[in-house]
Curated annotation (Swiss-Prot):
PANTHER family: UPF0102 PROTEIN YRAN (PTHR34039:SF1). It comes from Shigella boydii serotype 18 (strain CDC 3083-94 / BS512). Pfam families: UPF0102 (PF02021). Residues 1-20 are annotated as: Disordered. Belongs to the UPF0102 family. It comes from the Bacteria. Residues 1-19 have a biased composition (Polar residues). This is UPF0102 protein YraN. SUPFAM superfamilies: Restriction endonuclease-like. InterPro entries: Restrct_endonuc-II-like, tRNA_endonuc-like_dom_sf, UPF0102_YraN-like.
């Protein structure tokens, strides 16, 4: 878990949620620097959450953001399991339906932005609804 200095000078521990939120902001800025446009963050639908929704041209990009301090145990990208992929697909399906779309009518993909230590890895089209 990360620490941040406080006004008193002694560091305080960030919660897991605060750490995740900070890395999601980093990922959003990094992707915007690559030309993607921000649509939404922390989208909750029944059964799941999508960290970021971005647009690249006409493509809707659902982004899972992961952070690990080290590559021990496979690093950040390896932590996106089949179960997590299924939840993301279901959440995206519900979000698209709320916006009058579906996987058949909207060009979309699922990316992973993985921060491992000081390294960033952008895995475009990491998985899809046919995986």
């Amino acid at each position: 878990m990360a620490t941040v200095p406080t006004r008193s000078g002694s560091p305080r521990q960030l919660t897991t949620k605060q750490t995740g939120d900070a890395w999601e902001v980093q990922a959003r800025r990094w992707l915007e620097g690559k030309g993607l446009r921000f649509v939404a963050a922390n989208v909750n639908e029944r059964g799941g959450e999508i960290d970021l929704i971005m647009r690249e041209g006409w493509t809707t990009v659902f982004v899972e953001v992961r952070y690990r301090r080290s590559a021990l145990y496979g690093g950040a990208a390896a932590s996106v399991t089949r179960s997590k992929q299924h939840k993301l697909l279901q959440t995206a399906r519900l979000w698209l339906a709320r916006h009058n779309g579906s996987f058949d009518t909207v060009d979309c993909r699922f990316d992973v932005v993985a921060f491992t230590g000081n390294e960033v890895e952008w895995i475009k089209d990491a998985f899809n609804d046919h995986s």
